[in-house]
């Protein structure tokens, strides 16, 4: 804008958009600090402005040591950003895991043309949300297998230091409204997403997370997931329907095969 251009000229930073951005951030930070308020924002506020845009991984030290809270969101599998929250936490920043590949309710779970939502962060199903290990994202063997993540990729990623676990203060789900055209679609995106997310956010870690042997961990994961999804399908959804009624649910279509003249079908819940 002409105002920004004049400001940059007056402050001898013509063409340096990172400097302009940091000046703006400083004004916001100082204003909030004067009210004893904590500055919060998407983790983009700590990333350098480059042509990579939202795929950038270079962290500025501009706010190093300052009291800010980062919501770390863009972590599509294989995109080089799964470990960003650990990088921030290891640098001392307080963070909230807001993963687009698991905690965005508007992400569709497959290529079904009847789905309403987006897929720019991959296809995220309910198991993707449930299997997130907040403190070790690659401990999730389901997500690793589903997205063909290599051993080399995992080994090159930053790990969270045990001394910095307290810098991850929680998780957060998001729902964006670009494709929400009516109340039914809103219900559809919330249910049963909010049930699965609440289990992840408020319950203690499932047993599979602490199983050291990889094969045994996968067996335990599948067993616990099967138990949880049956609880949703047989108890939780019928209870909610009985109490509230009239809600729209996102229930993925069943898969089926015909074998020996019999139909075999499966369902998500």
Language-model-detected regions and their locations in the chain:
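C-terminal functional modules
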Residues: 140-269
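Structural recognition of the beta-strand scaffold that forms the well-ordered cores
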Residues: 39-42, 69-72, 94-98, 169-174, ...
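Acidic/polar loop patches that form or flank catalytic/metal-binding clefts of enzymes
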Residues: 33-43, 95-99, 204-210
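Active-site neighborhood of glycoside hydrolase catalytic domains
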Residues: 1-69, 73-92
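Aromatic-lined glycan-binding groove of carbohydrate-active enzymes
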Residues: 82-174
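Histidine/acidic-residue-rich catalytic or RNA/ligand-binding cores of hydrolases
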Residues: 1-2, 52-55, 106-114, 183-186
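Active-site beta-loop-alpha junctions enriched in small/polar residues
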Residues: 44-47, 73-75, 100-103, 174-178
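A glycine-rich phosphate-binding loop feature that marks nucleotide/adenosyl-phosphate handling sites
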Residues: 41-52, 101-107, 211-216
């Amino acid at each position: 804008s002409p105002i920004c251009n004049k400001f940059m000229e007056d402050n001898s930073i013509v063409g340096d958009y990172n400097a302009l951005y940091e000046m703006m951030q400083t004004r916001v930070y100082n204003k909030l600090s004067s009210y004893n308020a904590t500055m919060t924002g998407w983790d983009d506020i700590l990333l350098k402005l480059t042509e990579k845009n939202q795929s950038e991984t270079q962290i500025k030290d501009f706010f190093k040591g300052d009291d800010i809270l980062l919501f770390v969101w863009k972590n599509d599998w294989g995109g080089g950003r799964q470990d960003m929250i650990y990088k921030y936490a290891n640098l001392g920043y307080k963070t909230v895991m807001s993963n687009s590949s698991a905690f965005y309710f508007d992400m569709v779970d497959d290529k079904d043309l009847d789905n309403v939502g987006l897929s720019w962060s991959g296809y995220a199903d309910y198991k993707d949300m449930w299997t997130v290990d907040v403190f070790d994202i690659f401990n999730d063997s389901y997500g690793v297998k589903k997205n063909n993540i290599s051993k080399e990729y995992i080994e090159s990623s930053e790990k969270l230091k045990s001394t910095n676990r307290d810098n991850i203060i929680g998780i957060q789900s998001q729902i964006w409204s670009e494709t929400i055209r009516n109340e039914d679609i809103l219900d559809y995106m919330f249910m049963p997403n909010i049930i699965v997310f609440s289990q992840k956010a408020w319950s203690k870690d499932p047993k599979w997370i602490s199983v050291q042997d990889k094969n045994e961990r996968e067996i335990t994961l599948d067993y616990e997931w099967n138990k949880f999804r049956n609880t949703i399908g047989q108890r939780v959804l019928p209870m909610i329907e009985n109490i509230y009624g009239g809600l729209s649910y996102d229930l993925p279509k069943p898969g089926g095969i015909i074998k020996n003249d019999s139909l075999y079908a499966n369902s998500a819940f």
